């Protein structure tokens, strides 16, 4: 590498929203804020969140189900 053309590669602390602090190195040279990390991400923790899709589908059908129906003769 050429001398004096590369940014300084410093040690920084990356802090997650859950409070986990990860020590890493970066050219950013400022503390980093993370949204998720391996301590709180559902993929790594095994805690999956399920959405209440059934209630939404029923609500949609009750509101708009009659628009697509054909009239019986």
UniProtKB/Swiss-Prot annotation:
Pfam family, one: Ribosomal_L31
Cofactors required: Zn(2+)
Keywords: Metal-binding, Ribonucleoprotein, Ribosomal protein, RNA-binding, rRNA-binding, Zinc
Gene Ontology annotations for the cellular component aspect, listed alphabetically: ribonucleoprotein complex; ribosome
BP term (GO), one: translation
Keyword RNA-binding: yes
Binding site for Zn(2+): 16, 18, 37, 40
InterPro entries reported for this sequence: Ribosomal_bL28/bL31-like_sf (IPR034704), Ribosomal_bL31 (IPR002150), Ribosomal_bL31_A (IPR027491), Ribosomal_bL31_sf (IPR042105)
PROSITE patterns assigned to the protein according to its UniProt record, in alphabetical order: RIBOSOMAL_L31 (PS01143)
Cofactor note text: Binds 1 zinc ion per subunit.
GO molecular function: metal ion binding; rRNA binding; structural constituent of ribosome
Functional summary from the UniProt entry: Binds the 23S rRNA.
Assembly: Part of the 50S ribosomal subunit.
Family listed: Belongs to the bacterial ribosomal protein bL31 family. Type A subfamily.
Name this polypeptide is given: Large ribosomal subunit protein bL31
Organism listed in the record: Pseudomonas savastanoi pv. phaseolicola (strain 1448A / Race 6) (Pseudomonas syringae pv. phaseolicola (strain 1448A / Race 6))
Lineage: Bacteria, Pseudomonadati, Pseudomonadota, Gammaproteobacteria, Pseudomonadales
Gene assigned in the entry: rpmE
